[in-house]
């Protein structure tokens, strides 16, 4: 992924900056999309006088899970992926066998760490995780979240 800051103007004046990550099709993750109706966003757009955006293409969940597990198992500040993975698992039906195949391909392709990984707490994760998890329907303790994520990895690895 290549991160960019996109600066938006409104009525000719600087308005805000939004982060954008652009990636390339590493293992077929962009070959097919899961389409989602943007009902809530459509209502907001229409309330502001804009046309509803309709459907949006999303990366398939098995590939999202693979990318998040790869990110959270490497060095760095990806404590947010612990939260994302819990939310994905709670709100969607993840095909664990497809996720296993995507994880094996992605980890092999990137050659940074082995599949299946062991998730370990990184420096700064206690504070980062606590601030991000507050008010969300996820485990509130980072150590519990890491334990849960390692169990999630085991469930994926056991799927056939």
Where would I find each of the regions flagged by the language model?
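Structured mid-to-C-terminal alpha-helical surface segments
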Residues: 1-160
């Amino acid at each position: 992924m290549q991160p960019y800051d996109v600066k938006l103007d409104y009525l000719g004046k600087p308005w805000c900056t939004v982060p954008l990550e652009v990636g390339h099709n590493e293992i077929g993750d962009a070959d097919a999309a899961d389409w989602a109706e943007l009902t809530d966003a459509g209502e907001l757009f229409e309330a502001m006088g804009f046309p509803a955006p309709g459907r949006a293409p999303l990366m398939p969940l098995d590939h999202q899970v693979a990318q998040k597990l790869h990110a959270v198992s490497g060095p760095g500040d990806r404590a947010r992926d612990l939260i994302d993975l819990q939310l994905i698992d709670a709100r969607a039906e993840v095909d664990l066998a497809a996720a296993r195949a995507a994880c094996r391909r992605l980890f092999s392709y990137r050659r940074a760490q082995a599949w299946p990984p062991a998730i370990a707490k990184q420096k700064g994760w206690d504070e980062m995780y606590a601030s991000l998890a507050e008010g969300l329907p996820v485990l509130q303790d980072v150590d519990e979240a890491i334990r849960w994520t390692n169990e999630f990895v085991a469930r994926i690895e056991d799927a056939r």
